[in-house]
């Protein structure tokens, strides 16, 4: 049930020095680097996708979160258009859901309760008196696994996370997968 903002269509083509090599290869690239550690010591990584035109997107394994998207302005100069932070610590101290994958449910569940198959479930309350975007420790606050993949469309990274039975009060385990692809047509999907 993970929601991801997708289908961002970008116009124009520009490059910056760090993207020139990827453009020459005509297929794009994915760069992995350390982004910090959670309070319980889990390593968080950043994956930067660069397409053949030099467009860039960065996604971190914490919340499968989009933290950067570089697109050209009217003069062809690339700039980051994503609201967010430059470091993990700022996300760990609380964030307004910038660029995250939310779930198990996006939006509010009134009073943190729902009935499924005749049984009432009580969820974590994090938007008094409601449950919002998966709860206090929702999937936006989990470290996801990541795997680099490539397709004809452009460079991609697949993120996966399994929410165990009972996490934040939800019944059943749920396997989730989110794939970010930066197409060579300058779309992030």
Could you describe each region identified by the protein language model?
Residues 19-189:
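Surface-exposed acidic/polar loop and edge beta-strand patches at domain peripheries
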Residues 2-12:
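Bacterial N-terminal signal peptides
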Residues 11-13, 17-21:
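Boundary at the C-terminal end of the N-terminal hydrophobic targeting segment
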């Amino acid at each position: 049930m993970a929601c991801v903002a997708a289908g961002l269509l970008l116009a124009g083509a520009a490059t910056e020095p760090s993207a020139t090599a990827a453009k020459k290869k005509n297929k794009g690239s994915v760069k992995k680097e350390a982004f910090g550690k959670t309070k319980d010591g889990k390593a968080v990584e950043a994956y930067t996708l660069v397409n053949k035109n030099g467009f860039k997107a960065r996604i971190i394994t914490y919340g499968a979160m989009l933290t950067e998207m570089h697109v050209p302005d009217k003069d062809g100069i690339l700039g980051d258009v994503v609201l967010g932070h430059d470091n993990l610590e700022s996300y760990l101290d609380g964030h307004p859901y910038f660029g995250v994958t939310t779930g198990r449910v996006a939006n509010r569940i009134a009073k943190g309760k729902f009935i499924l198959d005749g049984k009432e479930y009580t969820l974590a309350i994090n938007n008094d008196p409601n449950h919002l975007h998966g709860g206090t420790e929702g999937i936006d606050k989990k470290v996801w696994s990541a795997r680099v993949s490539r397709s004809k469309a452009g460079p991609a990274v697949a993120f996966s996370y399994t929410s165990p039975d009972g996490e934040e009060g939800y019944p059943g385990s749920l396997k989730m997968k989110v794939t970010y692809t930066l197409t060579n047509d300058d779309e992030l999907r």
